[in-house]
Each structure stands twice: as structure tokens, then as C-alpha cells.
UniProtKB/Swiss-Prot annotation:
Function: Component of the aurora kinase complex, also called chromosomal passenger complex (CPC), essential for chromosome segregation and metaphase chromosome alignment. Mediates the SLI15-BIR1 interaction within the CPC.
Domain of life where this protein originates: Eukaryota
Main location as per UniProt: nucleus
Cellular component GO terms, alphabetical: chromosome passenger complex; cytoplasm; nucleus; spindle
Family label: Belongs to the borealin family.
Keywords assigned by UniProt, alphabetized: Cytoplasm, Cytoskeleton, Nucleus
GO molecular function annotation: protein-macromolecule adaptor activity
Known partners and oligomeric status: Component of the aurora kinase complex composed of at least BIR1, BNL1, IPL1 and SLI15.
Protein name in the entry: N-terminal-borealin-like protein
Organism classification: Eukaryota, Fungi, Dikarya, Ascomycota, Saccharomycotina
Length: 73
């Protein structure tokens, strides 16, 4: 039979889990922010018609749409 955890042990376990979840949340938020920045950069490039050729524009559009699709999932 598995012994029950003491209140102190439960609290330590909760604290460790909450800390790990907070770190994971911060990492996820940073990744989302990076994706937003990259998407905005690419969209800004698309708004400058002289700066990119048609094939480059198509590639940028494809990349932006792929990123948006990943974000929705």
C-alpha cells in the first residue's frame, strides 16, 4: 500500500508543479511573441511591392499562412 503524503509533502509537490507550469507558460508566451514578430515582419515586407519579387511574395505569403495555421491549432 502507498503511504499518504503529509500536508507538507503535498504543498511541496504543488509548489514544484506550479513552478514548472509557470515556466512552461512563460516559454509558450515567448514563442507566441516571436511568431507574432516574425509574422509582422513578413507582412511588412509584403506591403512593400518594390522590395520583393513575385516568387518571394508568394513564399512569404505561404510562410505567414502556415504560421497562422499552426497558431490556430
Amino acid at each position: 500500500m502507498i503511504p499518504a503524503l503529509t500536508p507538507e509533502e503535498r504543498q511541496k509537490l504543488r509548489s514544484a508543479i506550479l513552478h514548472r507550469m509557470q515556466l512552461e507558460l512563460e516559454t509558450t508566451e515567448k514563442l507566441i511573441e516571436n511568431i507574432k514578430e516574425e509574422t509582422l515582419k513578413k507582412l511588412n515586407l509584403l506591403q512593400q511591392p518594390d522590395a520583393t519579387s513575385a516568387p518571394q511574395s508568394k513564399e512569404l505569403i505561404r510562410e505567414v499562412l502556415e504560421q497562422e495555421g499552426r497558431r490556430i491549432e
